[in-house]
Amino acid sequence: STYKIYDALFGLEEGVITPQDSFIAWNGENYPFEAWNADQTLQSAMASSVNWYFQSVDEQLGASDVYSYIQEIGYGNENMSGDFSSYWMESSLEISPIEQVELLTKLQNNSFGFAPENINAVKDAIRLSSSDTGTLYGKTGTGRVNGQDVNGWFIGYIETADNTYFFATNIGADSDATGGNATEITMSILSDMNIWK
């Protein structure tokens, strides 16, 4: 699900969604999470990690455009050979924590050269909280295989008055490897390092 940051950016760059209008109507299908069973905007879809929203963006982009963007930004192994509806869900597209941080750095300073308003729309969608310390941006991800949570992610960055701190936490286990657990670990470390209070 951390890939959704970039999928949103591709959709914005191609005008499938815009910073002013990112609405996509719910198709009425019953999903396992209540928050998914409603119309969505980029903000709500990112906050609740609504798979169907990003699948809809992909469908409107088309596989060749998505692949071009994945290559352009250098996302992980750039492998889209898995099913087009799920290539980023514990499938062919893979990325390492180091690669996650490298991409977040490029997002934060827009070395992609994308439209600034599109970069800002994605940043707004992943802004989690602000404090006296600074502003926290992030996205969780949970990979499920055979009904077990085996791959948990929390990636993001903290902007302070004088620095930006990037992070990517990935936990793998036979079960309970969730984005929520990755978030707890990350925030504990950032607190211990006096980066976030």
For the regions a language model picked out, list residue spans one by one.
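Structured C-terminal helix/loop/strand segments within mature extracytoplasmic catalytic/sensor domains
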Residues: E59-G62, T105-G134, T140-K197
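Surface-exposed patches in mature extracellular/periplasmic domains of secreted proteins
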Residues: P19-I24, D58, E78-F84, S111-I119
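Mid-domain, small-residue-enriched loop/turn segments at the edges of structured enzyme/sensor domains
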Residues: E34, T41-L42, S56-L104
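Soluble non-cytosolic domains of exported or imported proteins
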Residues: S1-T2, T18, W36-Q40, S44, ...
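Active-site SXXK
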Residues: S1-F23, A45, F167
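Solvent-exposed loop/turn segments at secondary-structure junctions
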Residues: N30-Y31, W52-Y53, Y75-N77, S85-M89, ...
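Active-site-proximal loop and beta-strand segments within enzyme catalytic domains
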Residues: E13-Q40
